[in-house]
């Protein structure tokens, strides 16, 4: 069940290449993100996301794959969601 809207979904070239190389389906990451499975976040960041959903603030997920991470960020106004690598932020 979706907790919030994603808006327009975009992905950086680096994130798409990483997902392709590691056989990661970006749609599964989006599904986890909007269902409240925010991956590898601290308890503080999990609480911040819960607050963000209630108060229409930015929602952030971080999924770890070995030593690498893929981030998913939904903007506060829910106009867009971006899949990216941390060094592309």
Question: What do these predicted regions represent?
Answer:
Residues 1-59:
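Compact soluble domain cores
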Residues 56-89:
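Short, compact, well-ordered microdomains
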């Amino acid at each position: 069940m979706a907790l919030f809207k994603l808006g327009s979904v975009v992905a950086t070239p680096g994130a798409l290449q990483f997902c392709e190389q590691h056989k990661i389906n970006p749609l599964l990451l989006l599904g986890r993100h909007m269902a409240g499975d925010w991956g590898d976040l601290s308890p503080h960041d999990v609480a911040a996301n819960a607050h963000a959903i209630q108060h229409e603030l930015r929602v952030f997920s971080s999924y770890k794959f070995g030593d690498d991470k893929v981030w998913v960020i939904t903007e506060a106004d829910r106009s867009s969601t971006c899949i990216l690598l941390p060094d592309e932020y």
